[in-house]
């Protein structure tokens, strides 16, 4: 997705480790061509193993899911479980309640309308919730929001650029035969 491509660029620019999860081999190649280090394909037989390895290497304990399900509704739970496995791989002691590392997945889109399924293999220190831009802006305040807007404006042709198959004018957009 365009958002995934933007995330690769901004995280690389800001030295923030990022783990990307995609569904197709061509998406893996695209993100890697942009400089992504960790790209896991949900359709790969080693998906969970690759995801745990990437999470160990990055230390990531926060995830964002655009689908709200994916992988038959299991993707958010798979992410949490992989985070738990990564936390336990470096844990100093065992607890029957799981690691004490807090893991969070935010669903910010509803591309997959089927139920989100959680197979509880991620201990007791976790969260799953929704994420929307408008409430986040209220929490960070107008000054920080303005800084973010300025960054997007200054990087609109680079970091935040989108690729389109075709551009049409506003007048053309109003013609049903062109929009189809």
Model-predicted segments: where are they?
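Aromatic/hydrophobic pocket-lining residues that form π-stacking "cages" and hydrophobic walls in ligand
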Residues: 7, 51, 152
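A short, hydrophobic/aromatic-rich structural module that often spans a beta strand
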Residues: 30, 126-139
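Mid-domain Rossmann-like dinucleotide-binding core that forms the NAD(H)/NADP(H) cofactor-binding site
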Residues: 1-45
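Glycine-rich cofactor phosphate-binding loops and adjacent beta1-alpha1 units
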Residues: 34, 38-129
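C-terminal hydrophobic helical "lid"/dimerization subdomain
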Residues: 80, 86-91, 133-180
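Residue-level detector of flexible, active-site-proximal loop/helix-junction positions
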Residues: 25, 46, 112, 132-137
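Terminal peptide-recognition signature
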Residues: 11, 31, 63, 79, ...
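Short beta->alpha linker loops
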Residues: 22-26, 42-46, 67-70, 168-172
